[in-house]
UniProtKB/Swiss-Prot annotation:
Transmembrane segments: 211-231
Subunit (UniProt): Component of the EvC complex composed of EFCAB7, IQCE, EVC2 and EVC; built from two subcomplexes, EVC2:EVC and EFCAB7:IQCE. Interacts with EVC. Interacts (via N-terminal end) with EFCAB7. Interacts (via N-terminal end) with IQCE.
Protein name (Swiss-Prot/TrEMBL): Limbin
Localization: Cell membrane; Cytoplasm, Cytoskeleton, Cilium basal body; Cell projection, Cilium; Cell projection, Cilium membrane
Domain of life: Eukaryota
Organism the protein comes from: Mus musculus (Mouse)
Extracellular topology ranges: 30-210
Gene behind this protein: Evc2
Length: 1220
């Protein structure tokens, strides 16, 4: 919104008119005096910001509007808008003032409206208002109803002498009105005019051409030089890469994720923050910043571990294919083709993960911002309500009491805002950590899915033999177990070293704070002694009051100057030290990263020469453990060196300042006192006493610092014990062993599985095993979130108690009532605010930590149970689908047999066919006996072949065992007594291997049995499908002969198939009709045959009517019986008394869940469980008695022998049950 106009003789200028709105006045209070608005006159319209486009340039400040939606919500919108028009030399400004009494639920009518518009510096042309001598024009309106708008407008031009170039002119407008509650309210609409200069430039085309040519030549030379150096660097790099390819032509693996520059730069950036925290000028926020840095470091460590897992999995796949090629099971061409397919799929997966990560981060950021705005809005509303209530209470108290209460209220609001900000930060960190975990789990599952899908695709294309694919998948599954164990070790190592790193950093920060406390104590002691010296001379009568005030003023001035100089020197020296520390730290860390990258590159090269995956994983384990320990040792040394340098700097400068204060006391102040006739002996006695006090104070502060340091060391040791490496590794091994037993037990429950089902089950189990680990960041963040929520809930409960006591003082205790008897409401409010502030400073009860620990344990157990339940549900669904299909086929076949019997009976009774004709029809349409006999023979052959193959495998195993022997070497030259112990030791060492072989053999037996059962079921299903098809043809033929109507046949099907749905019945009826049409097409009838069929139809019509009525009666009776049965069952269920479902926390015990550790929350409180114990769950008062069996769970991995079944007997029994 602007226009150009004359501002003088030398140039042109632009008028920028910013019209702001102070929207929505609130009627504050109901007292007789008018309260001026406390809102700042701010808005988006500023002198350097153009107004919005449109006919009227107006704006509304969002924060002001928010304040307008206060507790009364009777807002009035007051606007001053402008529009500039005309040519550059003669611009006119059209100004409009509007008062809008918006229609809200609590709006009121306004009266005695007075608008004061400042027009200083404007030449008003047309205005209905009254001008005053002070440059203000007034507008009056006696009454304004709700929903009406009052506006006035006028035109004006700017006085050329009023403003110069770049200057601003404020012309606000004010509105004063009266509400029905006799409150006078004043609103202000800021309005700013800014003059911007426009300089006319006369172009010189010759100069422009010369400048263009010179710039073009310089840029051309620079481009040529840059391309030359770039090409030279590429040539050198290409030569090095070609030499590396010549030395290692078969190394086609991708580089390790730890060699990427992104990970190194992230690590360097996070380490720079440590130096920033140590050199911070706000010691109180160091621990909070260190906590945020720990969460960021844990997230980065999770990302590094996930990248390491992906790289190892890719290398394992390449290694397995190379072993197959070397063993002759896979051709090199197929291996290259599969490697290219794997690489393409992995690249697509990485792109998908990256896109999903960006999408999730954008969504989470937007959601967190929205949540922050909502909570900030609610917090602001609560603060406004509290301020209104406090103003109402503090109306009739002294200014001192009101100022104290206002200060306490502001302090309380500041603490609440900090607590809310911390809660929002933790919630956002939890959302991000949860998103990272979900993406990591998704990537792991997709990686396994790619492997299984590519191998199945290779088998279907004929590129891979089924037995080779089976071998490869078995090796992959077995290797993935080793990979999971390796990643557990990596995670435990990272957890331990990061816990040690941040425990040491927390120790350094607190030591730094203790050192600063000691230094400040010495400074304060020296400053106190200086003033004490003057006061002692005044009390002794050697100084009068004027002299004392003069000396005190000088002493305070000198002390302030010394402290100010110390602060400035510390600030400057810390900046220099910060830069030096970062430079040295980056140099050493970068050097260490380069050394480790070289070793990791050599490890990647060694993967191509590794004999098997176990050797490759062992190399990863040793190298990563060594690198992690070396890097942590370097970072700990750098942190300690940074603290030492900072400590030396702070102590030297502080001692210098303390020495200056003491010198001021012993020289300058002593001379001033001696000039004023102070006795030397008295002065010397005071100086000696101060010297002894200084020495004692120094000794006391140093002892306190040493004691604090010992406490911090104990805290670091306790933290390291909680995150012990061996404990976490053992816990994960125990958990994986338990889940392996559970999954094997669930798998053995499956009776029949095909090869595709086995692959799907194996992939599902692999995905479940890959989720048994715990990320580094998410558990720690979740523990802090729960702790923060528990603290906020506890504090809110305490606040409610305090507010209830403030609202009803008579409910307080007698002693408290006597103490507060002489106090007024202001004293009670002050005490209430002090108690609330004290709650923020106090620690939460210990019971909250126990409650948080119980919730964390319950959440982890629920996640594990959910994985088991999901795996079990997939197996049950698979088996249920097979059983449902078989049961449906059998029921349909039984129903067809029943309908055949019914139709043949009607044909025989109506003498349409003789018995011999019926027998002939059955013999021609029912070859089921031969089908069933053939099926029985096939099943027996399959079983015999399976038993022979199993016996052959057992025989070969025993032959290998007899040929190889037990594998125990006899010790050479050893005592006979010690030979037995040595052989026994060897046998015990080989026991684990034998057990694994036995478990593998059991798994193979179960898989072979499941596959055999599935093949037998497939043969049975095919036979039953053939029988159903033949039965449908016979039913169609008989229904054509009996002339049965379609509706009657449908009701007949509903009777013999009561569990079938209407679509299934209609599909079956359509199948019968298709068979019927086939017969009709085969046997075309002539006219005489049509007349015969018509007579037959009339003959059977009576019988079908009787049968139809009987079916109707049967259906009605069956429906009534079902309704009665359902009503009785409902009544029985409602009469039962159920125990209410309680939330239980499953604690670890022998013979149950393995031991599960938790993230540390304060001091640990162990929960012992032995035998039958009564426990209080989460302090709810509910007692639960837990009984534990001392025996381990009996989980048999042996599949029971399959019982042979006689299909004919089973079919007859099922048919008899169906007819019954």
């Amino acid at each position: 919104m602007g226009a150009t106009g004359p501002t003088g003789a030398g140039g042109r200028a632009t008028w920028v008119l910013a019209g702001n709105i102070l929207a929505a006045a609130l009627v504050l209070g109901s007292g007789p005096r008018a309260l001026p608005p406390s809102f700042p006159a701010l808005g988006p319209g500023s002198p350097s910001r153009p107004g919005p486009a449109g006919p009227w340039a107006s704006s509304q400040y969002s924060d002001i509007s928010r304040e307008a939606r206060g507790p009364f919500e009777n807002g009035v919108i007051f606007q001053k808008c402008s529009l500039v028009s005309g040519q550059s030399e003669s611009q006119t400004m059209h100004v409009q003032l509007s008062v809008n009494n918006t229609r809200t639920p609590t709006s009121v009518n306004l009266s005695n409206l007075l608008v004061l518009d400042e027009i200083t510096g404007l030449a008003v042309k047309e205005s209905p208002g009254n001008n005053t001598q002070d440059g203000i024009q007034t507008f009056r309106k006696s009454f304004l109803q709700v929903g009406e708008c009052y506006s006035v407008s006028y035109t004006a031009s700017l006085d050329p002498t009023a403003l110069g170039t770049g200057e601003s002119l404020d012309l606000p407008a004010r509105l004063i009105f009266q509400s029905p509650s006799q409150n006078r309210t004043q609103l202000k609409a800021p309005f700013t005019i800014t003059v911007e200069e426009k300089i006319m430039v006369l172009p010189n085309h010759g100069l422009h051409a010369a400048g263009f040519i010179a710039a073009f030549l310089i840029s051309l030379l620079l481009t040529v030089a840059a391309l030359f150096f770039l090409a030279r660097g590429r040539c050198l790099q290409g030569g090095m890469l070609s030499r590396c390819r010549i030395q290692h032509p078969e190394n086609k693996l991708e580089p390790s994720p730890f060699t990427s520059a992104n990970g190194v730069s992230q690590d360097l950036s996070l380490n720079d923050q440590v130096v920033a925290i140590l050199t911070s000028e706000e010691p109180g926020s160091m621990l909070q910043a260190l906590e945020e840095l720990e969460i960021a470091t844990l997230n980065q460590a999770d990302a590094d571990l996930e990248a390491c897992r992906n790289q190892i999995s890719k290398d394992i796949i390449a290694l397995l294919m190379k072993n197959l090629v070397s063993g002759g099971h896979l051709s090199p061409q197929t291996e290259r083709k599969m490697a290219a397919a794997f690489k393409k799929q992995f690249l697509l997966l990485e792109n998908e993960i990256q896109e999903e990560y960006e999408r999730k981060m954008l969504a989470l950021t937007a959601e967190c911002d929205l949540e922050m705005r909502k909570k900030t809005e609610n917090q602001y509303q609560r603060e406004m309500v509290a301020m209104e209530e406090a103003e109402e209470v503090l109306k009739r108290v002294s200014e001192r009491s009101a100022a104290e209460c206002s200060s306490l209220l502001r302090t309380l609001h500041g603490l609440e805002q900090e607590d809310m900000q911390r809660s929002l930060t933790l919630d956002q960190a939890e959302d991000f950590a949860q998103a990272h975990r979900q993406l990591a789990v998704f990537q792991r599952n997709e990686l396994h899915s790619i492997v299984y899908t590519q191998i199945q695709s290779a088998v279907s294309k004929g590129e891979l033999r089924p037995e080779v694919a089976k071998m490869m998948l078995q090796d992959y599954s077995k290797t993935q177990e080793s990979v999971e164990e390796l990643m557990d070790f990596f995670q435990a190592t990272k957890r331990y070293h990061l816990s040690k790193r941040f425990g040491h950093r927390e120790y350094l920060v607190q030591r730094l704070q203790a050192m600063e406390t000691r230094v400040q104590g010495l400074l304060n002691t020296a400053a106190t002694q200086l003033t004490s010296l003057i006061h002692k001379h005044e009390r002794a009568g050697y100084l009068d009051e004027d002299q004392m005030e003069t000396l005190l003023e000088r002493a305070q001035t000198e002390t302030f100057s010394i402290k100010q100089k110390l602060d400035n020197d510390l600030k400057q020296e810390k900046k220099r030290l910060h830069q030096r520390l970062i430079t040295r730290r980056r140099r050493e860390l970068l050097q260490k990263h380069k050394e480790q990258q070289k070793e990791q590159v050599s490890l990647g090269e060694a993967s191509s020469t590794a004999e098997d995956a176990v050797q490759y994983l062992h190399q990863w384990r040793s190298v990563m453990a060594e690198h992690t320990a070396a890097l942590e040792e370097l970072q700990e040394r750098l942190d300690q060196a940074a603290l030492d340098d900072l400590r030396v700097l702070t102590v030297s400068l502080s001692e210098k300042a303390t020495e200056e204060l003491r010198r001021l006391q012993s020289t300058a102040m002593t001379q001033e006192l001696l000039k004023r006739s102070a006795p030397w002996l008295f002065l010397q006695q005071i100086l000696e006493e101060h010297s002894r006090e200084s020495a004692a104070r120094t000794t006391q502060l140093e002892a306190e610092e040493r004691e604090r340091g010992q406490e911090l060391v104990q805290g670091v040791r306790q933290r390291l014990q909680q995150d012990a490496l061996e404990a976490y590794t053992e816990e994960q091994a125990e958990l994986r062993h338990w889940e392996h037993l559970v999954f094997m037990k669930l798998c053995c429950a499956a009776i029949s599985l095909s090869e595709e089902d086995l692959l799907r089950v194996r992939q599902e189990a692999q995905g479940c095993f890959s989720q048994l680990d715990r990320s580094l960041a998410l558990p720690r963040v979740r523990a802090r979130v729960l702790q923060q929520q528990a603290q906020m809930a506890w504090r809110e409960a305490e606040f409610r108690k305090l507010d209830q006591a403030l609202a009803a003082p008579e409910l307080q205790s007698k002693a408290r009532k006597l103490r507060s008897k002489g106090r007024g409401k202001a004293d009670l409010l002050k005490k209430n605010l002090e108690d609330k502030i004290r709650l923020f400073e106090e620690r939460a009860p210990v019971e909250l930590a126990d409650q948080v620990r119980g919730e964390l344990l319950q959440e982890r157990v629920q996640r594990l149970e959910a994985q088991e339940a999901h795996f079990a549900e997939s197996l049950v669904a698979l088996q249920f689908q097979k059983v449902a299909r078989a049961a449906e086929t059998l029921s349909v076949y039984t129903a067809l047999l029943s309908i055949q019997d019914l139709l043949l009976g009607e044909l025989s009774e109506s003498e349409t066919l003789t018995k011999s004709a019926c027998v002939q029809i059955l013999e021609s349409h029912r070859p089921e006996l031969q089908e069933l006999q053939e099926l029985e023979r096939k099943l027996e052959d399959q079983l015999v072949q399976q038993e022979e193959a199993e016996q052959q495998r057992v025989l070969e195993s025993w032959q290998r065992w007899a040929a190889d022997g037990p594998g125990l070497s006899e010790p050479e030259e050893m005592d006979p007594e010690r030979q037995v112990s040595a052989i026994l030791r060897q046998a015990l060492n080989k026991g684990q291997k034998l057990l694994e072989q036995h478990q593998q053999r059991v798994r193979e037996e179960w898989q072979n049995g499941a596959v055999l059962e599935d093949s037998l079921e497939s043969i049975e299903a095919d036979t039953m499908a053939s029988l159903c098809s033949q039965g449908l043809r016979l039913v169609s033929y008989l229904s054509r002969m009996t002339m049965v109507p379609g509706s009657t046949l449908l009701r007949l099907l509903s009777v013999v198939l009561p569990a079938a749905s209407q679509p299934q019945l209609l599909a079956l009826l359509d199948a019968v009709s298709e068979k019927h049409s086939d017969h009709t097409a085969e046997n075309e009838s002539s006219g005489e045959q049509a007349q015969a069929e018509q007579s037959k139809r009339r003959k059977h019509q009576v019988w079908w009517k009787v049968l139809d009525s009987r079916f109707r009666a049967d259906l009605v009776s069956q429906g009534l019986e079902r309704m009665l049965w359902a009503r009785q069952k409902k009544e029985r269920i409602l009469k039962k008394i159920y125990v209410p479902v309680q939330e239980r926390v499953m604690f670890p015990g022998k013979g149950s869940w393995p031991h599960l550790s938790l993230e540390p929350i304060g001091e640990l409180a162990p929960i012992p469980i032995t035998g039958a114990d009564a426990m209080d769950i989460l302090n709810t008062g509910e007692k639960i008695f837990v009984f534990r069996s001392p025996r381990e769970p009996e989980i048999s991995l042996r599949v029971p022998p399959r019982r042979k079944k006689n299909f004919l007997n089973a079919k007859k029994a099922n048919r008899a049950l169906g007819l019954d």
